Amino acid sequence: MQNDAGEVVDLYIPRKCSSTNRIIGAKDHASIQINFAEVDPTTGRMTGQYKTYAICGYIRQMGESDDCLKRLAIKDKIIDAKMDA
């Protein structure tokens, strides 16, 4: 629903699982959202930017959330592909 200014208000906007692209329902209490902070390579401090991933409860139930997060982090070049071994 939009107000007169065109802003979205009072509307549930569901998230999607970053790994499977499934919609995470409102009653999926096992789902998680995790932020990876970007770090300045010279100072070693956080830059204030981060990458957000959402993992649905179905993936967590199967015990595959760690593999999914690692695969997504390699795809987004957060960790090196050499760590895949």
Curated annotation (Swiss-Prot):
Superkingdom of the source species: Eukaryota
Signal sequence coordinates: none
GO molecular function: structural constituent of ribosome
InterPro entries, per the entry: Ribosomal_eS21, Ribosomal_eS21_CS, Ribosomal_eS21_sf
This protein's GO CC annotations: cytosol; ribonucleoprotein complex; ribosome; rough endoplasmic reticulum
PANTHER family in UniProt: 40S RIBOSOMAL PROTEIN S21
Subunit (UniProt): Component of the 40S small ribosomal subunit.
Protein's name according to its UniProt entry: Small ribosomal subunit protein eS21
Name of the gene: RPS21
